[in-house]
Amino acid sequence: MAAPYQREQAAWIPKTRLGKMVAEGKITTMEEAFETGLPIKEYQIVDALLPDLVDEVLDISMVQRMTDSGRRVKFRTTVVVGNGNGYVGLAQGKGVQVGPAIRKAIENAKLNIIKVARGCGSWECGCGLTHTVPSQVEGRAGSLKVVLMPAPRGLGLAAGGPAKKVLEMAGYKDVWSRTEGETRTTINFALATYKALESTTTVRTRQKEEAQ
């Protein structure tokens, strides 16, 4: 079960323009932060604006590399963060120990946070609630393609492993999915799903422009 990210840290001293605006109380929501158009370069910005964010470790793998001084081992972790209500982030982290690698992945995932679009896009439903993707979207990572399609309320998440967890963290309840390619690599499966969700906002924006 995912748990809130808790870590002892020194008082945050923002270094970026957006960070200073958040610390001064000029920016109080993630939507306002995105509207500035400024990049999120400090994970503490997300901590401040999304205090209900939780994290889940999707994969931990050991990477070995031969050097002149001998064999060196590092751990590579894949983590997804989300608040179950429209925000999700995904990233990897590396370290000589598992703990620091996980913490780095969490921080990186927060820097990759996105707001996804939700709706009731299934012709089988029409309930008007925000429980599925608003339209069909797809994402690619390596040789893998993930296609997400609107599903009727009550179906659940018809997706496997990492994809299901990413969808849950983003706040989706019902989604059809289809994959093309190799799904055994956790990072590619999760990343392709994340990229598909990333395009939900693009699709929604384009539809609004066409309607005007």
Swiss-Prot record:
Entry keyword set: Ribonucleoprotein, Ribosomal protein, RNA-binding, rRNA-binding
Domain S5 DRBM: 53-116
InterPro entries, per the entry: Ribosomal_Su5_D2-typ_SF (IPR020568), Ribosomal_uS5 (IPR000851), Ribosomal_uS5_arc (IPR047866), Ribosomal_uS5_C (IPR005324), Ribosomal_uS5_euk/arc (IPR005711), Ribosomal_uS5_N (IPR013810), Ribosomal_uS5_N_CS (IPR018192), Ribsml_uS5_D2-typ_fold_subgr (IPR014721)
Entry keyword annotation includes Ribosomal protein: yes
Pfam families hit by this protein: Ribosomal_S5, Ribosomal_S5_C
Known function: With S4 and S12 plays an important role in translational accuracy.
Entries under HAMAP family matching the protein: Ribosomal_uS5_A (MF_01307_A)
Name assigned to this protein: Small ribosomal subunit protein uS5
Organism of provenance: Methanocella arvoryzae (strain DSM 22066 / NBRC 105507 / MRE50)
Lineage of origin: Archaea, Methanobacteriati, Methanobacteriota, Stenosarchaea group, Methanomicrobia
